[in-house]
Amino acid sequence: MEVHMIIDFHTHAFPDALAMRTMEKLSQNSGFAPAGNGTVAGTLKSMRECGIDKSVICNIATNAKQTKNVNRFAVSANEHPELISFGSVHPESDYESELDFLKESGIIGIKLHPDYQQFFINDPKVTPLYEAILKRGFILIFHTGKDVGVGEPTHAAPDRSREVLPMFRGEKVVFAHMGGFLMWEEAEILLGEDIYLDTSGCPQLLAPEKITDMILRHNPKKILFATDYPWENPKTGLEYIRSLPLADEVKRGILGENARTLLNSNGAEL
């Protein structure tokens, strides 16, 4: 297959002072052994080893008090040209002013994690938050499905996610983990909708024939390669996508061109 730009649309990194402690806690809670140390330097090293050109860092403000610190780190990570760092806002934070700061700082996307941030994706109380994000033109990526490190209830189960689709039509919205981590049968109700889906969390858990079917039933141009690094070895994710029985053009799109088009539409200039 001809080599084109490879973009990992879903990774995580933490400030050096917090990375070791954070990774230990997350690994203990989830039962997953990480493939990296959670630092920016570790992410860049992994990218070089795997041939990944760009990575999106999905930062998460897990409570209102940490929102500013999370976003200052997000801005600093963008000093590395290989990284495209997204910000995050908590529903209970002063998100209007924080979104303005992020916009002025060149951040082009926002990550929300309903489980960590303790809101149901279809709760009308968060509609103003969605509107504030989208009216500023941000790309919006959600964790969807289960999170084994958090437990029940699942705040962004596919049936709940489907309820918010009308407000996202025509917007740049990504549902991570193919629409529902560990809930892929239920996530079929999202296929064909006007959203992007990313492939993070799928290689070792979602059968190749199943994800191939989902990709073809959705819109292959709205599928984004993603690894959730450091929770997945990017080499595993790359091999998984490259092995799927899809046309080379479709694979090139998934591995980078789809993300490149989306990111460039928000000024990334890739």
Predicted segments with their positions:
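Active-site-adjacent C-terminal substructures of enzyme catalytic domains
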Residues: 167-172, 179-237, 243-249
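Conserved, mostly hydrophobic/aromatic
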Residues: 10, 47, 74, 102, ...
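Divalent metal-binding pocket/active-site signature
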Residues: 36-37, 61-65, 91-93, 105-187
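Hydrophobic faces of well-ordered beta-strands that scaffold small-molecule active sites
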Residues: 7-11, 55-57, 84-87, 108-112, ...
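Acidic (Asp/Glu)-rich catalytic clusters
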Residues: 44-51, 71-82, 98-107, 127-136, ...
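Short aromatic-enriched loop/helix-cap "lid" or pocket-rim segments at secondary-structure transitions
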Residues: 17-22, 68-70, 98-99, 153-154, ...
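Short, well-structured secondary-structure segments
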Residues: 51-66, 73-75, 80-90, 111
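Mid-to-C-terminal alpha-helical segments outside catalytic/metal-binding sites
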Residues: 2-12, 18-54, 217-222, 235-270
